[in-house]
């Protein structure tokens, strides 16, 4: 159960980083 919580927090952190970069710059990753 602890590993599941760790993966969930890690996913949230990566998603936050991705959205921060995506909204800071014009989306260049899709192309």
From Swiss-Prot:
Pfam assignment, any one: PsbT
Compartments where located: Cellular thylakoid membrane
The keyword Transmembrane is assigned to this record: yes
Parts of the chain that traverse the membrane: 3-23
GO cellular component: photosystem II reaction center; plasma membrane-derived thylakoid membrane
Keywords: Membrane, Photosynthesis, Photosystem II, Thylakoid, Transmembrane, Transmembrane helix
InterPro entries noted in UniProt: PSII_PsbT, PSII_PsbT_sf
Membrane-topology descriptor: Single-pass membrane protein
GO process terms (BP): photosynthesis
Keyword Thylakoid set for record: yes
Record text on subunit structure and interactions: PSII is composed of 1 copy each of membrane proteins PsbA, PsbB, PsbC, PsbD, PsbE, PsbF, PsbH, PsbI, PsbJ, PsbK, PsbL, PsbM, PsbT, PsbX, PsbY, PsbZ, Psb30/Ycf12, peripheral proteins PsbO, CyanoQ (PsbQ), PsbU, PsbV and a large number of cofactors. It forms dimeric complexes.
Cited function: Found at the monomer-monomer interface of the photosystem II (PS II) dimer, plays a role in assembly and dimerization of PSII. PSII is a light-driven water plastoquinone oxidoreductase, using light energy to abstract electrons from H(2)O, generating a proton gradient subsequently used for ATP formation.
Similarity comment text for this entry: Belongs to the PsbT family.
NCBIfam families, per the entry: PRK11875.1
Protein name in UniProt: Photosystem II reaction center protein T
Organism: Synechococcus sp. (strain WH7803)
Upper lineage: Bacteria, Bacillati, Cyanobacteriota, Cyanophyceae, Synechococcales
């Amino acid at each position: 159960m602890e590993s599941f919580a760790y993966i969930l927090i890690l996913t949230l952190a990566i998603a936050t980083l991705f959205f921060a970069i995506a909204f800071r710059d014009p989306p260049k990753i899709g192309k």
